[in-house]
């Protein structure tokens, strides 16, 4: 298997997960358990060198993961190979693959014999168009190879005396072989960004433009000799594994390609602030292209990438067209930067609109309302205050025409007018009360026997407080003492009257 070239993942439960680089400092010997490199002991680093500390950390991590004192060289290599195979992303179910590895007894030969292509994901294709040349490439194919093959296809379609006799072979097998030869040398250069150095055959003001369309899978449309089929989830071409796949449909001429695929003359002028904002919003999704240093200044090599969702439309002529429904992202190399390319693509004369991006001039700006003194905005508040002062008593009693500010005050007052309610009226003296509790307290006066009776003299009282005051006579208790003359009093009312009459000046 082509992808079995580096570490394996989650094979030993007690091992650390780590992926070493190609230039690992571990030296493998025939007998690793007896090799001096496996028994190397580091002295403490006193110089504070970060490189030394990093190497020591990697050494310990590798030894803890691979355990060279317990495993043979073949076991460690198998562990590394399976780890890298899982990291390539081609496997459908990593858990199932790990279970197969355990079932094979960690034997790579038996493990490879039990494998089938069902464990791999189907290849994802990307539709690429450059100057009228179209093809389907594997998502992991280097962008430099894509541009090179499209140029060869373009030169093969031109009716020149040289290529009429010797046509360029652009078959699928040749493209696969080319991608496999060059992918190993370029895999380290495409980890974070896609690099394209074009301009090998540029002449004059010729422009090499590349259109990469990301589309979803829909039923294919066939009309005439052109068949367009776009797989689901296609991503832009980049470097990766050495397995590449390319399909070339019939190459239409430049006139048959839609106008939006044609390159534009991108200039450095008339870049407004809104275009800079548009660039800042979409620069994370755009593909970066770096031009070579050997390209003359009068040659312009640009990369034009559209990220779209393809939906079928009625077919026109010999070529079916789709409607892009996503924002256009463009990046340019050589003489014009990415920001200027976006500024030209979204110019004022361009009728296309970018969803989610609104110009500052189109955004509604609400005028601030000043609430200063004597301002018109304060008129509603002033009228409200005047009305509140004028109509302070909003609740009027229908019986006596009294005014009240609050509804609860009016309802409490209206209880006095409810003569028909017997619970508020004293039956004996016909006195009206606001609350039933007040009426009940009052009715004790009319009772022949008062409920509270003194235990000493058997005198009865209507209220309990009166009984307590009476009992102080029998006990001789005088709790209230004057601080000025030391006189004692039985009731608080008598004490306060004494203070007013005799100690007012004090």
UniProtKB/Swiss-Prot annotation:
The keyword Cell division does not apply. GO terms for cellular component: chromosome, telomeric region; cytoplasm; nucleoplasm; nucleus. Residues 1-24 are annotated as: Disordered. One of its GO terms (biological process) is telomere maintenance via telomere lengthening. Induction: Transcriptionally regulated by ZSCAN10. The keyword Translocase does not apply. Residues 37-119 form the SCAN box domain. Embryonic stem (ES) cell-specific. Expressed in only 5% of ES cells at a given time, but nearly all ES cells express it at least once during 9 passages. PANTHER family: ZINC FINGER AND SCAN DOMAIN-CONTAINING, ZINC FINGER AND SCAN DOMAIN-CONTAINING PROTEIN 4. This is Zinc finger and SCAN domain containing protein 4C. It comes from Mus musculus. The gene is Zscan4c.
